[in-house]
A protein has these predicted regions:
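Short, low-complexity N-terminal regulatory "tails/caps" that precede and couple sensory modules
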Residues: 1-5, 9-12
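Regulatory input/activation interfaces that engage signals or partners
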Residues: 10-127
Length: 127
């Protein structure tokens, strides 16, 4: 049996547990974090009819309080401070979104948002 197939079955089982368990999204995200070997997993559902998030859940290696504090600080910045949103929310976008294709290192070095909030939490990249 292929290793990825094992993960697939495991993740499917965790998905089925989400509506049955208060910690369902947390458990699923924690396992995805481990499988992908990343520092943060943020799952979002976007309603493109209104360009709003209808669901948002993030889990990472840092304590939840660190991410909650960072999210509150993040909300104080105008959306224009984060160039990822325009590309991410583009209803014409096809396929997987990866920010490294248009957010340069030079921009990151000069960005108050990246320097004060995103980088300290290990949130440089989005895919």
């Amino acid at each position: 049996m292929d290793l990825l197939e094992n993960y697939y079955n495991e993740l499917c089982e965790l998905i089925y547990q989400i509506p049955l368990n208060n910690d369902g999204w947390f458990n699923f995200s924690k396992e995805l974090l481990k499988i992908l070997n990343v520092s943060y997993v943020h799952i979002q559902a976007i309603d493109f009819s209104y360009n709003v998030l209808s669901f948002s859940n993030g889990v990472g290696l840092l304590p939840l309080e660190a991410y909650a504090s960072a999210e509150l600080d993040y909300l104080r910045y105008p959306t224009e401070a984060d160039p990822r949103w325009g590309k991410f929310l583009d209803p014409e976008r096809k396929g997987w979104y990866q920010c490294h294709t248009h957010v340069s290192e030079e921009f990151v070095e000069k960005s108050d948002l990246y320097q004060k909030i995103l980088l300290p939490c290990g949130l440089r990249y989005v895919a």
